Amino acid sequence: MTTAEDVAGNPYISDPRTDFESVEDVDAETAREQADQLREALRYHDYRYYVENDPVIGDRAYDALFSRLQRLESAFNLDTDGSPTQRVGGEPLDELPDVEHVARMGSIDQGGEEADVREFDSRVRNGLDGDVQYFCEPKFDGLSVEIVYEDGVYQRAATRGDGEVGEDVTENVRTISSVPQRLRGDYPDFLAVRGEVYIPRDAFTTFNRERVERGEDPFANPRNAAAGTLRQLDPSVTAERPLSIFFFGVLDASVDFESHSELHERFPEWGLRVCDRTAVVDDIDAAIDYRNEQQQARDDLDYEIDGVVIKVDDMDACDDLGSTARAPRWAFAYKFPARKEETTVRDIVVQVGRTGRLTPVALMDPVEVGGVTVSRASLHNPSLIADLGVDVGDRVRIKRAGDVIPDVVEVLDDDGDGHFEFPETCPACDSPVEHDGPMAFCTGGLTCPAQRERSVEHYASRDALDIEGVGEKAVQQLLDAGLVSDPADLYDLTVEDLTGLEGWGETSARNLVDGMDSAREPPLADFLVALGIPEVGTVTARNLAQEFGTFEAILDAADEGDTDAFEAVPDVGQTVARSIVEFFEGEGNRAVIDRLLDHVEPQAAEETDGDALDGQTFVFTGSLDGYTRGEAQELVERNDGSATSSVSGNTDYLVLGDNPGQRKQDDAAAHDVETLTEDEFEELLDDAGVL
């Protein structure tokens, strides 16, 4: 534990005097010495408050020390990296750029039944010799981030994103008081850590109340508030919100650790805040007991948890177990059951999704479920309404499935006097409703304004054409301003159109327009995904592109109603084939497609031998000019190669784009892996007959 003796002689540690002389009366040497002492003292007080939870001075004294340091640094130009004052919000950004993670931020296998966790334990013990100890910790319900320190100084932070690339939130995370700007003690030269950003419950309640008093909409739950705050473009907004963090893992470091429990002990020595509700247990029975104890305590905690994470404690054993393509074999998230509460249904409304699916939603008396006030719950489809027998005025039990989306699960009292009837026409466009099994769909296609709105967002999404700057908020702005009504309108946008909207700068506007220009010749498979054809995902779209070759051939088969031609495609059955034909038969859909074809020319799928890369393994780092990372990986995999996220002894090539990750280059050197520039990568593909 750090003590005041560690900073002996510093006058600002215990009961500090705050009646400073005027800055104008201080000479440069004295100012520099006093600023150094203040930085040291403020780091110490941050440590005592956030890590030790044992402050030695009050808030007023801390604020006085902080303010004095700010004035000294400003008056004498003494700003330094790692100063506590650097966490105050910086300049607003036009966008949050993407950044590649030091190491993959993978997900964890999870389950909510005891049988699930016992199966995990069985797999672990079958893969290891001897006894197994587990390190157990709460599963925080916040937003996971990567934070990088070099030589003990805070350098960078990023959201998890897709696990390989996240959003750069360096300046926003810098404002979080519990994130040290400089590490303490005998820290490693390089440290990339994983933490969970959250808003404490009490702070969330106060924060939401203040928003309502200002006439602003409250956040639905602490997690949404934390996520929205962390993605603010203006760090000064983030600085005013009550974010906190728990650190719980290492992604990469210049030192080794023998166990997860050792890691948990070392973090506080470096000033990194950890949760104190952890345990090392000798068997899975004790881990299950730990989980049950945390479930009992969850409502008394000042932070949201939705389960516990059980990890093999020994790091060497973790290495022996390894990982699957998506998750480590040495960890398991044992989830809590969904919370349930009672309330009364006041109305039932029907929402329209991107594919035209109609989803009934119950509007209810507000009820608190696990610290979150909810007033809406999904009823999923007309069949569920009939099965439950739910109606307006009924007393019902709801649960938060996965602690996120509320569902109505039971009618307790059906004495309500309402009588809900599922509509026969779409509430957004009055088109006839068609029933398919338990589900109901609007038949209006892209003539339906609700479907158009979702289709615009989907068209530009990462899974489709991956166009920068076209997210849910931007789409709503564009629709409200009358600038777009369907995906084709995106291609007509100008920088002048966009800079006239609130929150849009020259850079973000130019990025969107340039992104649309670069999407005028999309790969056929990506274009098919972007159209949002029901039942057609990435794999099916790729198979359709390979089988038909051109978009015109797909249109011809659809125009002829040739479901047999579609069923001949791998993974396409009767239901999917019929869905494809019906999509292209829709008049509204064809009108939008015809407009799109005025702007785009989908590129025919390249025919390849299929095994041109013959099992070679590629890793990509940095930004490529000619491909997105997904396109490059898909190109490799289509030709019998393998694309992985990390360099190992099995890697054949590391392909370097712009701003490549240094860690992957170091790993390539350690494993004697050949590196390629993008031009060399394309030469290799050309020699193999791929291009």
Curated annotation (Swiss-Prot):
Family: Belongs to the NAD-dependent DNA ligase family. LigA subfamily.
UniProt-annotated binding residues for NAD(+): 59-63, 107-108, 137, 160, 196, 311, 335
Cofactor list: Mg(2+); Mn(2+)
One BP annotation, GO: DNA repair
Top-level class of the enzyme under EC nomenclature: ligase
Annotated protein name in UniProt: DNA ligase
Annotated source species: Haloarcula marismortui (strain ATCC 43049 / DSM 3752 / JCM 8966 / VKM B-1809)
Enzyme active site: 139
Binding site for Zn(2+): 426, 429, 442, 448
Record domain BRCT: where: 608-691
An annotated Gene Ontology molecular function: DNA binding
Regions of compositional bias (Polar residues) in chain numbering: 641-651
Region (Disordered) residue spans: 1-22, 637-667
Swiss-Prot/TrEMBL keywords: DNA damage, DNA repair, DNA replication, Ligase, Magnesium, Manganese, Metal-binding, NAD, Zinc
Reactions this protein catalyses: NAD(+) + (deoxyribonucleotide)n-3'-hydroxyl + 5'-phospho-(deoxyribonucleotide)m = (deoxyribonucleotide)n+m + AMP + beta-nicotinamide D-nucleotide
Entry EC number(s): 6.5.1.2
Function (record text): DNA ligase that catalyzes the formation of phosphodiester linkages between 5'-phosphoryl and 3'-hydroxyl groups in double-stranded DNA using NAD as a coenzyme and as the energy source for the reaction. It is essential for DNA replication and repair of damaged DNA.
Upper taxonomic lineage: Archaea, Methanobacteriati, Methanobacteriota, Stenosarchaea group, Halobacteria
PROSITE patterns assigned to the protein according to its UniProt record, in alphabetical order: BRCT (PS50172), DNA_LIGASE_N2 (PS01056)
